[in-house]
Curated annotation (Swiss-Prot):
The active site is at 24 (nucleophile), 197 (proton donor), 200 (proton acceptor). This is Isoamyl acetate-hydrolyzing esterase 1 homolog. Keywords: Hydrolase, Lipid degradation, Lipid metabolism. The modification N6-succinyllysine is found at residue 63. It comes from Mus musculus. Belongs to the 'GDSL' lipolytic enzyme family. IAH1 subfamily. GO terms for molecular function: hydrolase activity, acting on ester bonds; identical protein binding. Its EC number is 3.1.-.-. Pfam families: Lipase_GDSL. Probable lipase.
Length: 249
């Protein structure tokens, strides 16, 4: 039997998956220096980091599409970690942005429903990380709104209400949570440098999110092995002894 035939007849090498689910702040996270790309680099040869960010989406729409993204599967097909990062659009002011706005109570219910759905497809709460929306720099975002011909359609105080609701859902459901809204404003610091336009993350904001998310994510993936041996550990005379079967890790 050839080496190719032996490899084909053996077990498939499955990469554990970390799934990032959110709005534009997640969609843009794979740009250069983005928090998603930083995670992918940190977890290389341990996990595939999947970007499932949808610009402009809110929890009302997210709840509908989640079952299309994650379904019950055997073992390693289930994500080892899932981030749920919504609220920046839900917290839009109803009068100024009714399409994206989601009432606070519904926002909480949608987050709960998504956590419950994940549990139903064998992604337990211990694998889930909720992330609150970041604070809003109203002065910078108002300039963006004016350029688009509309009024200021978000307020930081309102975003804070949604952040608090996200925290409460995490407490109720027993998931981890990253309180980005509070951390970026800690000790009344100027958080504007964390944002590129008052709403989305700047390079500094991406790094801030990455550094604060890592401790939560490490609890879920630190025990995972490096996939396939280090090159110096590959058997020189018969590399298949290292690269097939039990030599995967």
């Amino acid at each position: 039997m050839s080496l190719c035939e032996r490899a084909a007849s053996g077990s498939a090498l499955l990469w554990p998956r970390v799934l990032l689910f959110g709005d534009s702040i997640t969609q843009f996270s794979f740009q250069q220096g983005g928090w998603g790309s930083l995670l992918a680099d940190r977890l290389v040869r341990k996990c595939d980091v999947l970007n499932r960010g949808f610009s402009g989406y809110n929890t009302r729409w997210a709840k509908i599409i989640l079952p299309r993204l994650i379904r019950k599967g055997p073992g390693m097909e289930n994500p080892v970690a899932v981030t749920i990062f919504f609220g920046a659009n839900d917290s839009s002011l109803k009068d100024e942005n009714p399409k994206q706005h989601v009432p606070l109570d519904e926002y909480s219910a949608n987050l709960r429903d998504m956590v419950q759905y994940l549990r139903s497809v064998d992604v337990p709460r211990e694998r889930v990380i909720l992330i609150t929306p970041p604070p809003l720099c109203e002065a910078a975002w108002e300039k963006e709104c004016v350029l688009k011909g509309c009024k200021l359609n978000r307020l930081n105080s309102v975003v804070g209400e949604y952040a608090n609701a996200c925290l409460q859902v995490a407490r109720d459901c027993g998931t981890d949570v990253l309180d980005l809204w509070t951390l970026m404003q800690k000790d009344s610091q100027d958080f504007s440098s964390y944002l590129s336009d008052g709403l989305h993350l700047s390079p500094m904001g991406n790094e801030f999110l990455f550094l604060n998310l890592c401790p939560l994510l490490d609890k879920k993936v630190s025990s995972l092995p490096w996939l396939l041996p280090y090159w110096k550990d590959v058997e020189e005379a018969k590399p298949e002894l290292s690269l097939l079967g039990d030599g995967d890790y």
